[in-house]
UniProtKB/Swiss-Prot annotation:
InterPro entries: PyrdxlP-dep_Trfase, PyrdxlP-dep_Trfase_major, PyrdxlP-dep_Trfase_small, Ser_HO-MeTrfase, Ser_HO-MeTrfase-like, Ser_HO-MeTrfase_PLP_BS, SHMT-like_dom
Names of required cofactors: pyridoxal 5'-phosphate
Gene3D superfamilies the UniProt entry points to: Aspartate Aminotransferase, domain 1 (3.90.1150.10), Type I PLP-dependent aspartate aminotransferase-like (Major domain) (3.40.640.10)
Description of how the protein assembles with itself and partners: Homodimer.
Residues flagged as site, Plays an important role in substrate specificity: 225
Residues recorded as bearing N6-(pyridoxal phosphate)lysine in the entry: 226
Main localisation: cytoplasm
Broad EC category: transferase
Full protein name: Serine hydroxymethyltransferase
């Protein structure tokens, strides 16, 4: 007999699993689901182990299999990304960012980045991680018409302010940033270019989004759980010299991490191999679905941004819902209908705390097998709620709609023999 508190905990887990995995239309742009095989190998003995240091140079014994995994995973990512160096030890995208900033920017140095209101991540700004590093920041300018960095104005700022580091990539990221143009401007003043690829990492590996390392970026950072559908974690990849790569390694440990959540390595490795096999098809379908969702929303009288530009070239769709009460109100209403989105500031908003927009991503629903036809159905569900229909009535239809899309696609199948091997190795079967 288990304690009552454990039974209650298990009930919470089971309720959450059923709700989020089987009954909702999840459109959070920063989330995804792992394949059954990746989830299976995520349960392993590495979860309780330590491996401070680097491959072959650890501060603990008992790490020979950690070394094999970490070394193989880093080298495989490097090959796929055409990078000279990859560090998979950061436990998140933000930690990857902070370690790279620490290695590239001296105390008192200057960082140029997009503010949050233009889509920049909090870790790109002094409201987030940069605040702890004692650096100065300058804002990259925004081209409202093209929903992107203003290239000409950015060149002038780079020439005038001479930053040590320029951060590209974004949290609201509809169209590729002008990496090549910014890299050319950076070269003239000796600045490094970092591209935060967290949102588009899977699209890069799938070949449907430009690889920033091939366009002039010195470093990319990423998380491993958005369009790249692995476990939560981070990585750094660079094409810079050995001295800088060593500086990045020293920043990852001992400055910003001690242990590295080793249990995620195997699941990340499985996901990388799956993306090598299925990533091109998966990535193409993601971008296709995002555009289809935006077009369908527009037909329903809901206003996605970027119409003149084709709405999106990533997994994301951004919608101006100011006429429906703003982002916070709309996100809450949609959750009542089991449609999960997040409120999001749009570039013209006066306050990021009272956003006029919502942000959506189609990567998870795509992995459950949805296509352009389903995007039209989702747009209709959203429009019905926004136009005043009772969310609980829509919710019943959403739950029924999801019953057809339970199996995770673009990954390897598993059988009971594999499950038994893993569980027996951990003494989970008695």
């Amino acid at each position: 007999m288990l304690p009552r508190e454990i039974e209650e905990l298990l009930n919470i887990i089971l309720q959450h699993n059923t709700w989020r995995r089987k009954e909702t239309i999840n459109l959070i742009a920063s989330e995804n689901v792992m394949s059954p095989l990746a989830e299976l190998v995520y349960v392993n003995d590495f979860a309780g182990r330590y491996a401070e240091g680097t491959v072959g140079n650890r501060y603990y014994q008992g790490t020979k299999y950690v070394d094999i995994l970490e070394d193989s995973l880093s080298k495989r990512f490097a090959k796929v990304l055409d990078a000279k160096f990859v560090d998979v030890r950061p436990i998140s995208g933000t930690i990857a960012n902070l370690a790279t900033y620490h290695a590239l920017v001296p105390e008192g140095g200057i960082v140029a980045s997009l503010p949050v209101k233009y889509g920049g991540h909090i870790s790109h700004n002094t409201v987030g991680g940069l605040k702890a590093l004692r650096v100065k920041t300058v804002e990259l300018p925004w081209d409202f018409e093209n929903f992107n960095i203003d290239i000409d104005a950015a060149r002038k700022i780079i020439e005038e302010k001479r930053p040590n580091l320029i951060i590209l990539g974004a949290s609201l990221y509809l169209f590729p940033h002008p990496v090549r143009e910014i890299a050319n401007a950076a070269k003239a003043v000796g600045a490094y270019v970092l591209h935060d690829s967290a949102h588009v990492f899977g699209l890069i590996i799938g070949g449907v989004f430009p690889n920033p390392l091939k366009e002039g970026a010195h470093v990319i950072t990423s998380s491993t759980h958005k369009t790249f559908p692995g476990p939560q974690g981070g990585l750094i990849a660079s094409v810079t010299d050995e001295e800088l790569n060593n500086a990045i390694q020293r920043a990852v440990f001992p400055v910003f991490t001690s242990n590295y959540h080793l249990h995620r390595y195997a699941a990340t490795y499985v996901t990388l191999i799956e993306m090598e096999h299925f990533g091109a098809e998966y990535g193409a379908r993601i971008v296709e679905n995002a555009k289809a969702l935006a077009e369908a929303l527009a037909e329903e009288g809901v206003t996605p941004v970027g119409e003149r530009l084709g709405y999106t070239k990533t997994h994301q769709v951004a919608v101006d819902v100011s006429k429906f009460g703003g982002g916070d109100k709309v996100a809450r209403l949609l959750e009542e209908a089991n449609i999960i989105v997040n409120k999001n500031a749009l570039p013209w908003d006066k306050s990021v705390l009272k956003p006029s927009g919502i942000r959506m991503g189609v990567q998870e629903m795509t992995r459950f097998g949805m296509g352009k036809g389903e995007m039209k159905e989702i747009a209709k569900f959203i429009a019905r709620v926004l136009k005043g229909e009772d969310p609980t009535a829509v919710k019943r239809e959403v739950v029924e709609f999801r019953k057809t899309f339970i199996e995770i696609k673009y990954g390897f199948k598993i059988d009971k023999e594999i499950i038994d091997k893993i569980f027996y190795s951990l003494n989970l079967y008695t």
